[in-house]
């Protein structure tokens, strides 16, 4: 470690680098969303085997390739953050609340796909929340959410780290106000990658939708 550089400073630099990576992933995710929400695995050919004419196939392929490369960089960065975070906690008795809050939003399980605003083919195991109401002209409606959608991943929150408390999602929404939050949504037999931008609008809250725990979670 360079003289005068603390673990906290190194950790903050890595967290900032993580944000920059996620911003690049988001930009490419927007390309996929703009192309009929094709995501990382949607078909690029029509029923007759010809390239789809309702999307920019070249643009989609390039965005997917870029996202895969960025995800690999993201995974390595998350491993570095995990190591430094453990070191930081071991060095001090009282943690810095602001830094811990920022770090707590990270999906630091290295056995899972990287957290944050990601698009991934590895679908989470189960729904964490279900949408039962979407208000007209709300951020949720503009993102493409519909009543009945099961959300499998909400930003960095997935079935592996969700604690069954809606306040966990509320905290993420507040922290990500006016920023892109990537969602993995199951709608019937379809899985969609959507981009939600929490922000103030003419209605209540930052989303304009109501989410509840899925029935199986409430049975536990």
UniProtKB/Swiss-Prot annotation:
Pfam families: Nas2_N, PDZ_6
Gene3D superfamilies to which the protein is assigned, alphabetical: 2.30.42.10, 6.10.140.1710
InterPro entries: Nas2_N, PDZ, PDZ_6, PDZ_sf, PSMD9
One term under GO cellular component: nucleus
GO terms, biological process: proteasome regulatory particle assembly
Keywords: Chaperone, Coiled coil
Effect on the protein upon substituting residue 114 to A: Does not affect interaction with PI31
Domain named PDZ: residues: 102-200
Protein name: 26S proteasome non-ATPase regulatory subunit 9
Family, per entry: Belongs to the proteasome subunit p27 family.
Coiled-coil stretches noted in the UniProt entry, renumbered to this chain: 4-32, 61-91
SMART domains, per database record: PDZ
Subunit structure: Interacts with PI31; this interaction is increased by PI31 ADP-ribosylation. Interacts with Rpt5.
Organism: Drosophila melanogaster
Lineage, opening ranks: Eukaryota, Metazoa, Ecdysozoa, Arthropoda, Hexapoda
Function: Acts as a chaperone during the assembly of the 26S proteasome, specifically of the base subcomplex of the PA700/19S regulatory complex (RC).
